[in-house]
Amino acid sequence: MLALREPTQESSLKRQAYGQGSCPSIMSDGKARLATTSAQRSTEIMGDLEGRIALVTGGAQGIGRAIAEELAAAGATLALADVNEAKLAETVAELKAQGIDATAFTVNVSSEESIEAGAKAILEKFGKVEILVNNAGITRDNLMLRMKRADWDLVLNINLTGAFLLTQALLSPMLKNRWGRIVSIASVVGRAGQAGQVNYAASKAGLIGLTRSLAREVASRGITVNAVAPGFIETPMTAVLSEEQTKAMLATVPLGRRGTPKDVAQAVKFLASDAASYITGHVLDVNGGMFMGG
């Protein structure tokens, strides 16, 4: 058991020298100022999207919905695009019930005509899109020798070409206003590859290339272009995996768990915020350590 000692004059002087004990009001004021500063910084990061128009594709469920909720929490006005009209309407109704300003746009990103019509409707409604999140994506997995050309084309069309066409359709107002945030959802597979997913990996690697190239084109106009590369995330896409497949996947994750849509959404919100205004052409990995490359 430790014995307590009465404080000596020497220890009192030491505490005074280090600001301990002798000046409680100064310490309290300092802590209060620190707490206030931290709160202000948190508010700046969390709420600096006030009034910004944000479009999230694939926004009806999963990662897309989580992104929409995070951006709304930071003050953004939402435009949600999805091909699933019924699910999209349900999601927007639920968001509105929470007091979130959200508008639904039915868009099929595999169709150039649908993208053009959707972009036109969005611009007519809001005049501009300041934050674009290219989230819509699908998988059609198979081994190379068994993969059908139609499955290759569909995955590339939705995951890559759709993002290209929509970004192209909405870029002009960003250039004119000299401000914009473009964030595309890539994948750890686009960074490291994966057997049985040559189409998906190619589409996501292509999205990373698009991100870095476009970042160089538009940086001088105040527009940042980045990507988030999720790993093993709890989504409808991964829900179909068997218990054995899930265990095998988790064995490759140093953090030992699946990520959540919110993990990805918070990364997107950061890249859309002023806190990330000096970051462009970057791929932010959200994968629990599955991939640690450059």
Residue locations for each model-derived region?
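Short C-terminal tail/terminal secondary-structure segment
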Residues: 38, 44-45, 192, 269, ...
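Canonical Rossmann dinucleotide-binding motif of NAD(H)/NADP(H)-dependent dehydrogenases/reductases
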Residues: 48-78
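Substrate-binding pocket helix/loop in short-chain dehydrogenase/reductase
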Residues: 143-144, 148-156, 238, 249
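Active-site helix of classical SDR
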Residues: 167, 203, 211
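Alpha-helical segment proximal to the catalytic Tyr-Lys
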Residues: 172, 216-220, 277
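Residue(s) in the substrate-gating loop at a strand-loop-helix junction
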Residues: 187
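C-terminal helical subdomain
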Residues: 227, 251-275, 279, 286-288
